[in-house]
């Protein structure tokens, strides 16, 4: 087989990134956009010794699980890997992915782990409360906004995203008209010239409050009063609450700058998860799917088994989303987060909700927890962890084992590191009692999982 040669392959499996997997004469091929059960014609693009990557050219026999993607740019955009798969099959794929990692990486037996059915969405569209659109130009020099094509920084023009809120289209149209009227150029990565880099849009699902923040390659936004007028006036956007710009003059892939200049409104929007109110600024971390977040955190709260007498540690707590949920049922909650801005938000959110039994520490979980345990002899009945994709630090896990809480609730966004860390805790005297996946990101390969571990003896 040579590069650019075409061949026919039956897709028998899918890898963790959502690419179809098939074999030709014992050689493994990964075919993006193919679905289990498809028979496809593919073109060889890149080959290694025992496997290769191929481009989907034609679906010859569609799988029973294949559907027509609802999004017109599904294949070009890097955002959704599973749109060609029925939602029912997406959920099965995610459950299988988690279980496979628990068996393969965690070395658990399948009957050792009681996994409850995945929590899917009734409506797996329009679920994202946050969108970030890069700006650029098309080949004719017109200002465009959209998304980056997979693994590139080439902008795929898209006036809307079916995962985002319907107001996105309206806001993008206004921003493009504003730029044309004020003769403002979009940012160009190669030359580091041009002003508007991105537009950040956030919406409170329970409050209908909307935020717009332009990310600019400069200190000033010309015609800022006109932008406010266009977004808030008679033909503006309903629910517009906060308008600002973020200064980012660095040559970087990081979207937001550190300085936010407020143009209109209080500088934040509010939203609720359950009955807890949150203030969300342009730089705040906040779960992008609030509907499923409520289910996921509800599961974590249930697993914590709180009676009102417990001391709880919430590690990697972000802006305190889980902490404040737990504080309503616990005696005391301690939250730990590495990002100082997030801790400021957490303290403010506790104050807004009249929650006085939550205390927050800014620092690394693997430094704060051992220090509090060894120097101040703090106690924990329950420890909740919600780490980034890389999972928990070994020092952090060792300290959890030394503290010997009755229960550990592990909330994970990466089932590979989840499996690794669960094995570590299981070898240290904990039993994996039950777990449940939650589909926070329909259409994509990502899945969240909550697991309860109970101290053995």
Task: Tell me what each language-model feature is.
Residues 116-123, 189, 198, 202, ...:
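Short, solvent-exposed loop/turn elements at beta->coil junctions and helix N-caps
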Residues 201, 208-217, 277-281, 382:
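Short, aliphatic-rich beta-strand segments
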Residues 12, 126-138, 143-149, 201-204, ...:
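Short beta-strand elements
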Residues 2-6, 16, 222-457:
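Rossmann-like S-adenosyl-L-methionine
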Residues 20-25, 146-149, 213-215, 346:
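Short, acidic/hydrophobic/Gly-rich beta-strand patch recurrent on exposed beta strands
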Residues 57-69, 75-186, 206, 221:
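Extended interfacial segments that mediate partner engagement and assembly in macromolecular machines
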Residues 1-73, 109, 359, 367:
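Terminal RNA-binding accessory module
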Residues 37, 164, 289:
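Short, conserved phosphate/pyrophosphate- and ester-handling motifs at nucleotide-, phospho-/glycolipid
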């Amino acid at each position: 087989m040579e590069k650019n040669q075409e061949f026919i392959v039956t897709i028998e499996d899918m890898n963790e990134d959502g690419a179809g997997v098939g074999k030709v004469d014992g050689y493994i091929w990964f075919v993006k956009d193919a679905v289990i059960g498809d028979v496809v014609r593919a073109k060889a693009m890149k080959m290694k010794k025992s496997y290769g990557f191929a481009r989907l050219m034609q679906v010859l026999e569609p799988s029973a699980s294949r559907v027509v993607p609802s999004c017109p740019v599904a294949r070009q955009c890097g955002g959704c890997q599973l749109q060609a798969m029925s939602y029912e099959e997406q959920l099965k794929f995610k459950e299988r992915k988690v279980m496979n990692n628990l068996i393969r990486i965690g070395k658990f037996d399948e009957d050792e782990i009681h996994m409850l059915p995945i929590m899917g969405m009734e409506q797996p569209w329009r679920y994202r409360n946050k969108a970030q659109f890069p700006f650029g130009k098309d080949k004719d020099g017109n200002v465009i906004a959209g998304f980056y094509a997979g693994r590139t920084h080439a902008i795929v023009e898209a006036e809307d995203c079916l995962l985002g809120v319907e107001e996105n289209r309206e806001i993008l149209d206004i921003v493009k008209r504003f730029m044309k009227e004020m003769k403002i150029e979009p940012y160009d990565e190669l030359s580091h010239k041009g002003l508007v880099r991105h537009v950040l849009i956030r919406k409170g699902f329970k409050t209908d409050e909307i935020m717009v923040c332009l990310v600019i390659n400069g200190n000033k936004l010309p015609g800022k009063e006109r932008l406010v007028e266009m977004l808030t006036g008679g033909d503006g956007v309903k629910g517009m609450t906060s308008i600002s710009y973020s200064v980012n003059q660095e040559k970087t892939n990081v979207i937001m700058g550190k300085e936010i200049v407020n143009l209109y409104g209080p500088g934040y929007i509010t939203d609720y998860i359950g009955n807890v109110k949150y203030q969300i600024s342009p730089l705040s971390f906040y779960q992008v799917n609030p509907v499923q977040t409520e289910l996921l955190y509800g599961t974590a709260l249930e697993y914590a088994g709180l009676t009102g007498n417990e001391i709880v540690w919430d590690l990697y707590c972000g802006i305190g989303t889980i902490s404040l949920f737990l504080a309503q049922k616990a005696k005391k909650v301690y939250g730990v987060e590495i990002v100082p801005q997030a801790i400021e938000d957490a303290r403010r959110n506790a104050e807004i909700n009249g929650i006085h039994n939550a205390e927050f520490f800014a620092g690394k979980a693997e430094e704060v927890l051992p220090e509090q345990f060894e120097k101040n002899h703090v106690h924990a009945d329950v420890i909740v962890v919600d780490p980034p994709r890389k999972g928990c630090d070994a020092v952090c896990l060792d300290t959890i084992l030394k503290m010997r809480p009755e229960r550990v609730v592990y909330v994970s966004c990466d089932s590979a590191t989840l499996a690794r860390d669960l094995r570590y805790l299981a070898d240290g005297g904990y039993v994996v009692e039950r777990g449940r996946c939650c589909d926070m990101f329909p259409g994509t390969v990502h899945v969240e999982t909550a697991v309860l571990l109970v101290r053995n003896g």
